């Protein structure tokens, strides 16, 4: 338990520094090394067309944001996006492959299989602007594609009286 608490504290501290890190980066100017110096080793690297690639910086399960930072073929940062937004969630539709969901949203905070229903819930914690903590869930029945989605209050959020 102490180990998990330490991990959660470290993740929250890291996420708290994100606005400062972001302010130090500039699209078209900052290099991949600049990004890695500020954000560290990415959780995943996604290849893009034309020699570009996207670095995934995951703030789950303790945080409420995930960042995708695209590095162009020229080695310069071309985009920095916080991807856990209602607009991105609206793009997740039934039938979409989970690999594409993972690519769009980053690693979920939690994956929970429910044996009786045959469903698996993939949950991402996020903030509905300005400060409402919610959970976006993608439900699969075959483990490979989206059956449906839903958004619910984040009952584990400190704002709701139950910190992690």
Question: Which residues make up each language-model segment?
Answer:
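Sec-dependent bacterial lipoprotein signal peptides
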Residues: 1-15
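Residues within mature, well-folded domains
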Residues: 17-164
